[in-house]
Amino acid sequence: MEMTNAQRLILSNQYYLMSQMDPENSAKYQRLQTIVERGYELQMRELNKEFGCLTEAECREIIDIMEMYHAMQESNKMLADQERAEVDQRRLQFLGFDIASEAQIVHYVRFLVDSEGLYPQFDKADHHFNSQMPMLEKYRRMLTTWRNCPRQYHLCATELSQIFSA
């Protein structure tokens, strides 16, 4: 992250103020203040983590993935009891993404659910959409299979199984 000396001074002052206003996290803010004041570029990369960016296409892809799960859950509700018994109900739960490798996406999902009020039926579970394993590639394969289904919001048990297995 490139900053002028004036920008570094302003940010340093912000961290100082935060350390005074939030005593519980004072050590964290003092550390960040030191990094900015002294210009430790390796550690300044940490500051960039907070300012990630998801493109419009990436946002739409995440919404499509969540919509696919919504469609699968609604389709499952419409199945006859006998057909529903063929579907692994646990696989209908949207797990989210891996906070370690897909953090920006996890934060976006949380934003959509918590701030935007979308998909209130999704169970946050204990991990609040942190699947604890990378999921994006799996979801992409599932999305491709789902898009090939003729009736995406009225899936049969076989189609659900095919999507899960993608």
UniProtKB/Swiss-Prot annotation:
Disulfide bonds: none annotated. InterPro entries: UPF0304_YfbU, YfbU_alpha-helical_sf, YfbU_helix-hairpin_sf. It comes from the Bacteria. This is UPF0304 protein VS_1049. SUPFAM superfamilies: YfbU-like. Belongs to the UPF0304 family. It comes from Vibrio atlanticus (strain LGP32).
